[in-house]
């Protein structure tokens, strides 16, 4: 009788534990599916093994989500820090010039003009930074629509080069338009001109004095690939995955001295994404970089 009673109790405990494990499994399974009210799948066979596998998979998913959240938080901190630095530099410069003028510089016409010009340049840099941030925000939210049309790519490259010709001449960089005439693509002309201008400015800032920046193109399926090639300082491989991030700079001192906002390549990326096209970069440290964009071929 004692043995029968013991067996009955043991069987009851086993069924109780088994039922609770099944309930736990259904709960974990439903949570993975994003459901809180729908019963999960019924289990058969190795209950503990299935629970173990399900919990491990659920833990891996949570760890992945945590890693993504940590990466976003790191990006947010870097963005705020970089933005504060980009705003602080011109503001402090402007403040210094104005204080110098107030402390006696106004009496010297030469110093007066020089410091006012420098303060004006600082204001222009702030305006450019705010405008670029506003543009990126609008591109991300889809507020800015594209006015697509058929574009002569050779002419687009030519007009874009004319806008940066003075800056290129100051560093002795030769701009070469190797795009054949009558190469037609489709897109928003104003935005694509901004893309090329930003890529040219990047090539000028990081290019080699007396070097060359060349634009070439070739068809690839229904797309037209456009390559902007420079023979400048190039980039190490570890920089390439981040080069299109806001405020990310490879050569911080040179680009800041040139007065860039640090948003040029980020804007390029967003404009290309708005066109449902791509931009990629290949670079060799000490040998130069190649930025490639795709456009819809006509």
What are these regions (language model features)?
Residues 121-126:
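Short alpha-helical segment of the dimerization/phosphotransfer core of two-component systems
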Residues 203-204:
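Short helix-loop "hinge" at the ATP-lid/N-box region of the Bergerat-fold HATPase_c
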Residues 209, 276-277:
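Conserved glycine-rich
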Residues 210-222:
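Short beta-strand/loop element within the Bergerat-fold HATPase_c
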């Amino acid at each position: 009788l004692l043995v029968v009673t013991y067996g009955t109790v043991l069987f009851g405990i086993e069924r109780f534990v088994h039922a609770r494990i099944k309930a736990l499994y259904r709960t974990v399974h439903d949570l993975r599916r994003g459901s809180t009210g729908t019963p999960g799948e019924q289990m058969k066979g190795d209950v503990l093994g299935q629970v173990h596998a399900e919990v491990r998979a659920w833990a891996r998913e949570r760890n992945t989500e945590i890693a993504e959240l940590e990466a976003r938080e790191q990006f947010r901190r870097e963005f705020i820090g970089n933005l504060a630095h980009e705003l602080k530099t011109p503001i402090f410069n402007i403040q210094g010039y104005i204080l110098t003028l107030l402390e006696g510089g106004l009496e010297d016409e030469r110093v007066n003009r020089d410091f006012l010009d420098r303060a004006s340049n600082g204001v222009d840099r702030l305006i450019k930074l705010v405008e670029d941030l506003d543009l990126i925000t609008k591109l991300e939210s889809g507020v800015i629509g594209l006015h697509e049309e058929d574009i002569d790519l050779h002419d687009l490259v030519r007009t874009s080069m004319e806008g940066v010709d003075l800056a290129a001449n100051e560093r002795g960089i030769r701009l070469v338009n190797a795009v054949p005439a009558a190469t037609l693509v489709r897109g928003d002309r104003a935005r694509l001109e901004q893309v090329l201008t930003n890529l040219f400015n990047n090539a000028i800032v990081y290019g080699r004095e007396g070097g060359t920046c060349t634009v070439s193109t070739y068809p690839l399926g229904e797309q037209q690939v456009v390559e902007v090639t420079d023979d400048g300082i190039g980039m190490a491989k570890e920089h390439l995955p981040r080069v299109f991030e806001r405020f990310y700079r490879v050569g911080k001192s040179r680009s800041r001295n040139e007065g860039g906002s640090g948003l040029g390549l980020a804007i390029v990326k967003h404009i290309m994404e708005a066109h449902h096209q791509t931009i990629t970069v290949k670079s060799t440290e000490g040998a130069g970089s190649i930025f490639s964009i795709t456009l819809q071929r006509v």
